[in-house]
Amino acid sequence: MPHPSVRVEPGPAGFRRVRLDRPDRRNALDLGMVRPLHAAFAAEPATPILLDSADPGVFCAGADLTVSDAERAEISGLLYQCYEVMITRLGPVIAVISGPAVGGGAQLAGAADLRVAGPDASFRWTGPPGRALAVGAWLLPSLVGRGLALELTMTGRWVDAAEAERIGLVNRVYTEPGQAAAVLAKQLADQGPGAAGAAKRVAAAGGLLDRLRAERAANQAALAEPAAPQAQRDR
């Protein structure tokens, strides 16, 4: 039986743990990961989720760059559906980030309601070379403000854990982020099931979903175009 690249198992305080587990590809997102990931978030939408990686050295390297253009477009479309489910589901989502989170991986972390990071966490909001893609422009203004959001998406520069905490990209940085997330999960559970859903409904208002859908449509159109010649040579 093939090893599952997304594992769903019981987590702390009644949470369901959704664990990325494709260490040979640094949790790069192919259809074999994105389909069960979407299913895990869509199932039992009132159940809270803890999202983490089985490999503490890497959260997610983004979309798998070795797949075909057609599969890449399908992965992108499913990922944006996944982000929308994460935002609109009633149960809260806590992301535990250790190591790098790049492109679609950075968006997975950002789409969580709460983000707990280790000191080795880092983020980069960039897409595959040769593609005019917006990566996280729908989300980052709500987290760090418009000006910094545009800087991060336009330059694709790295953000380390200390800066991520300072600018509001993560809630907190802890030496043991998994343990801290378990404490946070208990705190949320103590508030009862309705409080988180009520807060999420209000936080998703005001254009967030409109921006998500606009970015998804723009990126689907861009992925339908041939890659730039240099990017084709680099593949």
What are these regions (language model features)?
Residues 33-36, 78, 215:
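Hydrophobic alpha-helical membrane-association signature
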Residues 26-30, 105:
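Glycine-rich acyl-CoA binding loop
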Residues 78-82, 136-139, 148, 195-198, ...:
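Hydrophobic alpha-helical segments typical of transmembrane helices
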Residues 1-13, 44, 54-56, 156, ...:
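C-terminal alpha-helix plus adjacent terminal tail
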Residues 11-21, 32-70, 85-96, 114, ...:
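A structural preference for short, pocket-lining loop segments at secondary-structure junctions
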Residues 69-78, 149:
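A short acidic, glycine-rich active-site loop
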Residues 18, 37, 51, 108-109, ...:
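Hydrophobic alpha-helical segments that mediate membrane insertion or helix-helix packing
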Residues 2-7, 85-193:
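Crotonase-fold acyl-CoA enzyme core
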